[in-house]
Swiss-Prot record:
Region listing for CRM (Cys-rich motif), in residue ranges: 695-930
Family of this protein: Belongs to the peptidase S8 family.
Organism: Homo sapiens
Compositionally biased residues, Gly residues: 26-39
FU repeats: 692-739, 743-790, 794-838, 842-887, 895-943
Name of the featured protein: Proprotein convertase subtilisin/kexin type 6
Length: 969
């Protein structure tokens, strides 16, 4: 197990993680993030000096690219199952550390006799592993650089140590001295009763402080794991710099507890929150794949605020295993509905970075989230690209407010910054939508964000309306997330049709890219109309896969124009990208064509705009490109357009959308009628008018007073209208009115009623368009209340199954269950007793494994809590911890968890440092194991300092003369 060593020092936030060298397919990946300033170098000179920096860049071109760093870990594909993988590993001197996440036949091998870190790939007899007939593929893991997407503190910024609810400006209007901004409408979603209940969110990061007072009430150990330390405690590694604060800050945004008199309120303050500790160590393809595959049928939302270097020159993305983990998650996660991956779009704006060079935010499987300042401006760190889906508020200039959240050491902070803020915000808002409708698929969630996000006051020069009526920008995607609109739409949402993929064009003809001019290549496509299982009519994601050679990659600009005329910028110039590697099968993705028709002519435009003098003979070349369309064959919203539905939804006031809380009494205030009592006044000559004119048949015995025959003085049946609106007599009252037989008047029904028996809100017989008839209360409502669902054919509110608290479409299609029941595949089933689990195939409670106290399945590795006298170890409940581990009590858990002893101990008791036996080469000294090596340069003064400060016992000098000093007395 690699030690928890701090990352290399540097001016940027801590590194994130790693790529790998594929020995089967050849070396892959783009250039590293080195350069004159070392890893993570970020030029921060004042703007007038930026051009001076550029003058120095040609010299940097001749510098060799940074070498990859290889580890002593391998990813290996072995056929035949776990036993065969163990055999193959042992035969070649490896240790099999187990299957990689949920990737069948892929295993994590470790070799203790090779260099832990090396700039050369490993050589020696152990490399014969690749020749084993059972090995189909292997990959020595290469350290990838991954950077947390927060921005560095501004020295001019002000900080406060009282981060409370009133400081959360982005959620409410509390500042009376400035213009109020609360367009994300989170409070309105809360008022509708949505707080994230029964939804599980986990943070992929450097760990979360599970005992923080604002996180502990919602902390979920079953949604947590320490991939770096290979145990179940995701707590961050503490040091003087507090560098591992990032995950704890993100977790607080999502699910900080409410009304506990501490710090803040999370957006989904009743959701469960977990943490995957995976950034505090070497991040490899194996580490990422493991992290993305932790409990996909338990965790609903994975939030990640990290990625490759945002340095304006890196092109990098997920490796082979991580890509497979993404695909497994969206196909199998959440019982087939699909795991939801939310990603921060990147902080490289100052370096001119473009987030389409980040393969994580550029993926169709992730929701890429951007940021805006409190005043609606582009933050200085924002990266533009066509794959951004939506936006939230975050930090901006030094004089603009930042985000309040939880912090390390049980504290709070008002200094959370960057797009790191935005991903967990959206994760929290999606949790509210999943509470409203737990049956949403991963694509439903993306459709909902497209449909309900809005430009609001976000300022950008590139806002455009695409061919489907959606307003979209490279800065902000479809706009600011609207939590209330999202939950209202989610509640009544019908799943979109199945996703189709169409490879619409594939052009392998090489073309030169002329300097300054534009290379245009077109593709006329039917969008696979001839194949029913591939046909795309309505677009979702559009991917352009390209291979381009070029002497200086950063000089390229790439655009894609859809048949509807929507122009997406797939790549902008990057002044710091001096690489001559070009692009190899790199996928650029755009969401700007969402909802448009796919069929027609697509145009790819490539421009080469040199930022410096370049040899004109060295031209770039488009080697090949493919157009891949994702979408549906049927309209995703059936009978209404997304744009119209969104516009209508935003026009409705909150009270109009709110379902009634209880039955209304007839005495309540009603809609005023434009009616007046009318008594006929006799006038001279009126009798003559009655005698000489023929009145309308509906006029009563008093006749009419003209000038027209229907100007009746009284009516046979009912009068309609008033003196002001010109009264008339009718035999039947029109829709929206009822007949008052005593007064012979047509009186207006209550708002929403089409027919009624009286003016009371509880006397509706049928409803106007846009309303549902609640038959039990005889009211007309825009949304059916809890316990009822909207029957679209009858336009009635019908009762849910008795076990359902909320349901959609059908009585038994539950979204929330009553107490004593649990949700399983849309049904509410009775809670199983301790020691049993719900079998969704047999629809009954089954017995857990005898080692489990509670479980999610019958297997030994499906325990949630252990039975009495059993300890949790390596996803299993065991009677005793294995060698090198000790049992430890964990707050909130009924069982003990096996924790690893100190690296020099063979066994320990009560604490990792309380050694009872030592490894070979070490001697026990009290409770510590010290090396048997002696040293000759330890004088009396040095040894006195070691002993007086108990440095050996504290393990600060465990390898430095401890034995020599202590044996010397």
């Amino acid at each position: 197990m690699p030690p928890r060593a701090p990352p290399a020092p540097g001016p940027r936030p801590p590194p994130r993680a790693a790529a790998a060298t594929d020995t089967a397919a050849g070396a892959g990946g783009a250039g590293g993030a080195g350069g004159a300033g070392g890893p993570g170098f970020r030029p921060l000179a004042p703007r007038p000096w930026r051009w001076l920096l550029l003058l120095a860049l040609p010299a940097a071109c001749s510098a060799p690219p940074p070498r990859p760093v290889y580890t002593n870990h391998w990813a290996v594909q072995v056929l035949g199952g776990p036993a065969e993988a163990d055999r193959v590993a042992a035969a070649h001197g490896y240790l099999n550390l187990g299957q990689i996440g949920n990737l069948e036949d892929y295993y994590h091998f470790y070799h203790s006799k090779t260099f832990k870190r090396s700039t050369l790939s490993s050589r020696g007899p152990h490399t014969f592993l690749r020749m084993d007939p059972q090995v189909k593929w292997l990959q020595q893991q290469e350290v990838k650089r991954r950077v947390k997407r927060q921005v560095r503190s501004d020295p001019q910024a002000l900080y406060f140590n009282d981060p409370i609810w009133s400081n959360m400006w982005y959620l409410h209007c509390g500042d009376k001295n400035s213009r109020c901004r609360s367009e994300m409408n989170v409070q309105a979603a809360w008022k509708r009763g949505y707080t994230g209940k029964n939804v599980v969110v986990t943070i992929l990061d450097d760990g979360i402080e599970r005992n923080h007072p604002d996180l502990a009430p919602n902390y979920d150990s079953y949604a947590s794991y320490d991939v770096n330390g290979n145990d179940y405690d995701p707590s961050p590694r503490y040091d003087a710099s507090n560098e591992n604060k990032h995950g704890t800050r993100c977790a607080g945004e999502v699910a900080a507890s409410a009304n506990n008199s501490y710090c803040i309120v999370g957006i989904a303050y009743n959701a469960k929150i977990g943490g995957i500790r995976m950034l505090d160590g070497d991040v490899t393809d194996v580490v990422e794949a493991k992290s993305l595959g932790i409990r996909p049928n338990y965790i609903d939302i994975y939030s990640a605020s990290w990625g490759p270097d945002d340095d304006g020159k890196t092109v990098d993305g997920p490796g082979r295993l991580a890509k497979q983990a993404f695909e497994y998650g969206i196909k199998k996660g959440r019982q087939g509905l699909g795991s939801i991956f939310v990603w921060a779009s990147g902080n490289g704006g100052r370096e001119g970075d473009y987030c389409s060079c980040d393969g994580y935010t550029n993926s169709i499987y992730t929701i890429s989230v951007s940021s805006a300042t409190e005043n609606g401006y582009k933050p200085w760190y924002l990266e533009e690209c066509a794959s951004t889906l939506a936006t939230t508020y975050s930090s901006g200039a030094f004089y603009e407010r930042k985000i309040v959240t939880t912090d390390l050491r049980q504290r709070c902070t008002d200094g959370h910054t960057g797009t790191s803020v935005s991903a967990p915000m959206v994760a929290g808002i999606i949790a509210l939508a999943l509470e409203a409708n737990s049956q949403l698929t991963w694509r439903d969630v993306q459709h909902l964000l497209v449909k309900t996000s809005r430009p609001a006051h976000l300022k950008a020069s590139d806002w455009k309306v695409n061919g489907a009526g959606h307003k979209v920008s490279h800065f902000y995607g479809f706009g600011l997330v609207d939590a209330e609109a999202l939950v209202v739409e989610a509640k009544k949402w019908t799943a979109v049709p199945s996703q189709h993929m169409c490879v619409a064009a594939s052009d392998k003809r090489p073309r030169s890219i002329p300097l300054v001019q534009v290379l245009r290549t077109t593709a006329l496509t039917s969008a696979c109309a001839e194949h029913s299982d591939q046909r795309v009519v309505y677009l979702e994601h559009v991917v352009v896969r390209t291979s381009i050679s070029h002497p200086r990659r950063g000089d390229l600009q790439i655009y894609l124009v859809s048949p509807s005329g929507t122009k997406s910028q797939l790549l902008a110039k990057r002044l710091l990208d001096l690489s001559n590697e070009g692009f190899t099968n790199w996928e650029f993705m755009t969401v700007h064509c969402w909802g448009e028709k796919a069929e027609g002519q697509w145009t790819l435009e490539i421009q080469d705009l040199p930022s410096q003098v370049r040899n004109p003979e060295k031209q770039g070349k488009l080697k090949e490109w493919s157009l891949i369309l994702y979408g549906t064959a049927e309209h995703p919203y059936h009978t209404f357009s997304a744009h119209q539905s969104r516009s209508r939804m935003l026009e409705l006031s909150a009270p109009e959308l709110e379902p009634p809380k209880a039955a209304l009494s007839p005495s309540q205030v009603e809609v005023p009628e434009d009616e007046e009592d009318y008594t006929a006044q006799s006038t001279p000559g009126s009798a003559n008018i009655l005698q000489t004119s023929v009145c309308h048949p509906e006029c009563g015995d008093k006749g009419c007073d003209g000038p027209n025959a229907d100007q009746c003085l009284n009516c046979v049946h009912f009068s309609l209208g008033s003196v002001k609106t010109s009264r008339k007599c009718v035999s039947v009252c029109p829709l929206g009115y009822f007949g008052d037989t005593a007064a012979r008047r047509c009186r207006r029904c209550h708002k929403g009623c089409e027919t009624c028996s009286s003016r009371a809100a509880t006397q509706c017989l049928s409803c106007r368009r846009g309303f549902y008839h609640h038959q039990e209360m005889n009211t007309c409502v825009t949304l059916c209340p809890a316990g009822f669902y909207a029957d679209e054919s009858q336009k009635n509110c019908l009762k849910c199954h008795p076990s359902c608290k909320k349901c959609v479409d059908e009585p038994e299609k539950c979204t929330v269950c009553k107490e004593g029941f649990s949700l399983a595949r849309g049904s509410c089933i009775p809670d199983c007793e301790p020691g049993t689990y719900f079998d969704s195939e047999l629809i009954r409670c089954g017995e857990c494994h005898h080692t489990c106290g509670t479980c999610v399945g019958p297997g030994r590795e499906e325990c949630i809590h252990c039975a009495k006298n059993f300890h949790f170890h390596d996803w299993k409940c065991v009677p005793a911890c294995g060698e090198g581990f000790y049992p430890e009590e964990m707050p909130g858990l009924p069982h003990k968890v096996c924790r690893r002893c100190d690296e020099n101990c063979l066994s320990c008791a009560g604490s990792s440092r309380n050694c009872s036996r030592c490894k070979t080469g070490f001697t026990q000294l009290g409770t510590s194991c010290i090396t048997n090596h002696t040293c000759s340069n330890a004088d009396e003064t040095f040894c006195e300092m070691v002993k007086s400060n108990r440095l050996c016992e504290r393990k600060l000098f465990i390898q430095f003369c401890c034995r020599t000093c202590l044996l010397a007395g």
